[in-house]
């Protein structure tokens, strides 16, 4: 009853706080982390949105529409983007473009297994001497990388929602049925989770995470176009 009367932002904040309490993470009363300083050139390179292309006027046939399922939330989970994973002191990203194996599995259980396996191999250096690691993903076009050792908090929030939404879409029989309505509600929660990374008052927001998500989205779309 309470959830049905809350905004998507309030719901996603409640989910984040629940996961934080389950994992023993301190929940800030109010956000008190200022945005990192940037030069004018850095701001020009990072403070960008998604990718928009103007279509060429004309009449076309055999047109194909390509849609991504939960693109931005999937980027959060598979690229391990979270406030605490950005530019960690223990990892140094490689300059080469990462293989698919370097991404975190979207399935929550598979993601947990991946990080347990990385910890078992003990391939990480100390925070004083960071080591080059292929799993520490370099954000395309930015001077930012994500940690290969720590499983990001935001990824652990969105991955179960993505999985549940995919299950509901598989059960949908027609547009507007109960399963369609439920998956659509989860869709807006996932969209809000992305937006909250750049919201100045979000407890677990960080503008650098928002910029990293947008950078990966632009890279994926440009790769698809090519």
Predicted regions and their residues:
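Conserved catalytic core of nucleic-acid polymerases
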Residues: 68-71, 77, 81-82, 90-226
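Common nucleic-acid-contacting/processivity interface regions adjacent to the catalytic cores
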Residues: 1-83, 89-90, 180-219
């Amino acid at each position: 009853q309470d959830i049905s009367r809350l905004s998507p932002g309030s719901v996603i904040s409640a989910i984040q706080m629940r996961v934080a309490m389950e994992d023993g993470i301190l929940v800030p009363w109010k956000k008190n982390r200022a945005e990192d300083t940037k030069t004018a050139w850095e701001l020009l390179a990072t403070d960008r949105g998604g990718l928009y292309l103007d279509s060429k006027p004309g009449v076309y046939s055999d047109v194909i529409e390509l849609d991504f399922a939960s693109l931005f939330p999937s980027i959060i989970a598979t690229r391990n983007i979270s406030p605490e994973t950005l530019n960690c002191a223990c990892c140094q990203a490689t300059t080469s473009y990462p293989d698919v194996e370097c991404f975190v599995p979207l399935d929550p259980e598979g993601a947990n297994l991946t990080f347990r396996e990385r910890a078992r191999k003990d391939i990480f250096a100390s925070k004083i001497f960071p080591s080059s690691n292929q799993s520490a993903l370099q954000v395309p076009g930015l001077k930012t990388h994500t940690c290969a050792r720590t499983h990001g908090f935001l990824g652990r929030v969105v991955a179960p929602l993505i999985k549940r939404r995919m299950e509901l879409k598989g059960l949908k029989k027609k547009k507007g049925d109960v399963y369609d309505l439920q998956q659509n509600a989860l869709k807006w929660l996932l969209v809000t989770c992305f937006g909250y990374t750049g919201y100045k008052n979000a407890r677990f927001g960080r503008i650098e995470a928002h910029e990293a998500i947008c950078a990966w989205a632009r890279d994926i779309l440009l790769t698809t176009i090519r």
